Design a protein with these regions (language model features):
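Conserved phosphate-binding/catalytic loops in two-lobed NTP-binding clefts
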Residues: 440, 458-470, 665-670, 677, ...
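A phosphate-binding glycine/aspartate-rich beta-alpha loop in the early core of alpha/beta enzymes
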Residues: 212-273
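Conserved phosphate/anionic-ligand binding catalytic regions in large, soluble enzymes, centered on
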Residues: 205-219, 310-321, 490-500, 566-587, ...
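A contiguous, well-structured pocket-lining segment that forms one wall/lid of small-molecule binding clefts
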Residues: 153, 164, 168, 175-177, ...
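Internal gly/pro-rich beta-alpha loop/helix module
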Residues: 155, 305-376, 569-570
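Conserved phosphate-binding catalytic cores of ATP/NTP-utilizing and phosphoryl-transfer enzymes
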Residues: 248-254, 300, 322-329, 350, ...
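Glycine-rich phosphate-binding/hydrolytic loop that grips phosphoryl groups
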Residues: 468-489, 493-495, 534-543, 644-645, ...
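Intrinsically disordered, low-complexity, mixed-charge
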Residues: 1-168, 172, 176-179, 190
Length: 720
């Protein structure tokens, strides 16, 4: 028989397991990688596959097994692993996964890998970040720079060893190594990791190279100085902690949050912080992003440190991708640099998520969770190149939509270059030849040039997809829903009327959408300036209400009044939250993406519904400005909750009314505002009370990181 097996079957010890099972059953034959698949030719039958499924490695996943008759040549006397073919393309490898308990114990022990940071086996370690192309063999990864020593070669060839056919097997004799240098590039004596740990303990700012990129490292008691040095005034930092006991010292995670934190994927998880966590780590928030070590280096670092927690934030120039180059990183001006000589092929930031019950809301889907895909069942090759903020691209092949790692915000040339590199790499891995390329409707987005060039290269059609329709399509694609009424709520997206949308009630399928209602339009005084100077939003609302304005001087008021007449309009839920945040004294200036909305969450969580915030729909607009007239009469938390509840209630009522008339039983929630747990709770409450099923994100990012999935789904539907 010939068995072609599809799934996560490369780089996880799958072929060695096939070998061991076949040998134990006395079978003859061969097993090989073939692009994205594994092909087994053997004299075994279905019982062999049943046994194989029962003994799968921890990281492996069999998705399908195709069987065909095959006469094994008499010349094959035994069972063996043979060289890879390359007739099939696709992503069948696992993500980078945290060092496993066996390798951790070995690294902390007294054997030949004692203290060796690159200790891994078939069950753990870097994969995607080291990989150039399929199939996953050592010569197609950056580990080809490090030929195996005899001892590692012996492990690689031993069927009983957990490093049997482990493509990145190495040791201190033959593998990558760390070095420690000062701010001028001069070597620092001593064990690199131990010395780096002592310098961090002493209050220095360091940069450490890991899998997929580099981190800026600091102790928690140096956060104010770190903010001044790095130029990050308010944006929260992620905190890496030594172990689960330390998580519980600083935070109150739910069981689901702790399960994600301790998973092999090791994302940053937003958890409720305790008073023991310094407030300046995540100012004005009731949560903090926390994660556990996932590399050997990080475990060794905490073994040597006196502190049990450290700031670990991506090392990059603001607005640019995370730095990979050892020379370029010196420009950041840290006190010391812990660097290694293993080439990073694919950059990957840490994944970031928050949990709403069992639903995973990915704020950033990257290291540990990519490559990944969703099955959509629509044939054809297509690419979606995403929006401008929180950029990703997606590539469709064989009924699946595969997404790139998190790219970043696309205003800079460096981010657009990174988008091109990551997308081209994924296209190559999948063997995709797109017939259609989808991009955002906004005419000014910097990635459009790449999209057009990509389409020209393949002779593909180019389509433009409205931003909030793409949000809806991303939710439909991951949930397997053909059509739905949905709330698509975020900061901004170019509308078909030329205005900035963002508070939308829609009916959508993959061929069209209807805009059922939207939040009241308000002027964006000064355009993009209003996104940061959020008093402009409050000023615009007070103009609509005819309210006295006492928070700007007369000259500024005159400038704002004149500018409002020619300003673009916005229906954004994000801008509505910004205006609330300013009105309630929560936030005066937006210094990072989503800041006012994030700082509203603690208020929303504590608030109760009070009378006086009821609203109505007038000519398709859900009225909001009137809520600000008497907002100061109420407790801040009650005003915040009641205003948001009133708007969500009216949006859900509008969606439910349409859904009832058209036999639809599901109502979705998508867009960046849906990351707010209180807003998700309010949405679910009203949807279920009205007798509908809420549809929420779990695998595709709620925010703009999921836009490319929706674009690609819409593009695929066009090909059918």
């Amino acid at each position: 028989m010939r068995f072609t097996i599809r799934g996560v079957v490369q780089g996880v010890g799958f072929r060695p397991t096939v070998y061991r099972v076949a040998k134990s059953m006395g079978l003859r034959g061969t097993v090989r990688n073939d692009g994205a698949y594994v092909v087994i030719e053997t004299d075994g039958n279905a019982s062999f596959i049943d046994r194989l499924k029962a003994e799968l490695p921890a990281l492996a996943l069999i998705e399908s097994v195709d069987c065909e008759e095959y006469a094994l040549p008499d010349s094959v006397k035994d069972f063996s692993i043979i060289g890879s073919g390359n007739t099939a393309r696709g992503v069948g490898i696992p993500t980078d996964t945290a060092i496993c308990p066996k390798c951790l114990a070995e690294m902390r022990g007294k054997g030949r890998r004692s203290g060796y940071a690159f200790t891994t086996c078939t069950e753990c370690g870097a994969r995607f970040t080291l990989m150039e192309t399929n199939p996953y063999d050592r010569e197609r990864t950056s580990m080809r720079d490090f030929p195996m020593c005899p001892e590692c070669g012996s492990e690689y060839a031993d069927p009983t060893d957990r490093r049997f056919h482990h493509q990145t097997v190495c040791c201190p004799k033959c593998g990558p190594s760390y070095r420690l240098i000062d701010h001028d590039g001069g070597p620092i004596d001593g064990d690199p990791i131990t010395t780096f740990a002592k310098m961090i303990d002493a209050g220095r700012f360091g940069i450490a190279k890991s899998w997929g990129g580099m981190h800026i490292c600091s102790t928690l008691d140096r956060v104010d100085e770190l903010r001044e040095w790095y130029g990050r005034k308010q944006k929260p930092f992620a905190v890496m902690v030594k172990d689960v006991e330390t998580v519980l010292k600083y935070a109150e995670p739910t069981e689901a949050e702790l399960r994600e934190m301790t998973s092999p994927h090791r994302p940053i998880v937003l958890v409720r912080k305790k008073d023991t966590m310094p407030e300046n780590v995540s100012p004005g928030l009731d949560t903090v992003g926390m994660f556990l070590p996932y590399t050997g280096m990080q475990y060794l670092l905490f073994d040597a440190m006196q502190h049990d927690a450290a700031i670990m934030t991506s090392a990059n120039v603001p607005g640019e991708p995370m730095i990979l180059n050892d020379e370029e990183i010196m420009e950041l001006g840290a006190d010391m640099y812990l660097l290694h000589n293993q080439r990073i092929i694919n950059r990957a930031d840490d994944s970031v998520m928050k949990l709403f019950g069992e639903n995973r809301y990915f704020l950033r889907k990257s290291r540990g969770h990519i490559p990944s895909y969703i099955d959509i069942g629509l044939k054809g090759d297509a690419v979606g190149i995403g929006p401008q903020e929180n950029l990703t691209a997606s590539v469709a092949k064989d009924g699946r939509i595969h997404s790139t790692q998190h790219i970043g915000n696309g205003e800079s040339l460096g981010v657009v270059d990174y988008l091109e590199t990551a997308t081209d790499s994924l296209i190559e891995m999948l063997g995709c030849k797109p017939s259609i390329v989808a991009m955002d409707l906004h005419p000014g987005y910097s990635n459009r040039r790449y999209g057009k060039a990509l389409a020209e290269r393949f002779g593909a059609e180019v389509i433009e997809v409205q931003h909030h329709w793409a949000h809806c399509a991303s939710l439909m694609a991951e949930s397997g829903t053909g059509e739905m009424a949905a709330l698509s709520i975020d900061g901004t997206g170019h509308g078909t009327d030329g205005n900035a949308w963002g508070g939308e009630v829609m009916f959508a399928d993959l061929t069209k959408f209807d805009r059922l209602a939207h939040l009241q339009y308000i002027p964006l005084i000064g355009g993009e300036k209003a996104l940061y100077d959020i008093r402009r939003l409050k000023f615009a609302i007070d103009m609509i209400n005819g309210t006295d304005i006492d928070y700007v001087d007369d000259r500024t008021a005159d400038v704002f009044t004149k500018a409002a007449k020619n300003s673009a309009l916005t229906s954004s839920f994000g801008r509505f939250l910004d205006a609330l945040a300013y009105s309630l004294g929560v936030c005066d200036v937006r210094s990072y993406d989503g800041e006012p909305a994030m700082k509203m969450e603690p208020l929303l969580a504590r608030g109760k519904k009070v009378e006086g915030f009821e609203t109505s729909v007038e000519n398709g607009e859900i009225m909001t400005a009137h809520m600000f007239r008497d907002i100061s009469k109420y407790r801040k938390e009650d005003a915040a909750y009641s205003a948001v509840d009133a708007v969500i209630t009216k949006m859900v009522e509008t969606a439910a009314d349409y859904a009832s008339k058209h036999g639809i039983r599901k109502i979705g929630l998508t867009g960046g505002v849906s990351y707010s747990i209180p807003i998700s709770q309010i949405f679910v409450k009203h949807v279920t009370e009205m007798g509908f099923k809420p549809v929420l994100h779990d695998r595709v990012p709620n925010g703009d990181g999921g836009i490319s999935v929706g674009q690609t789904a819409i593009a695929l539907k066009r090909l059918q």
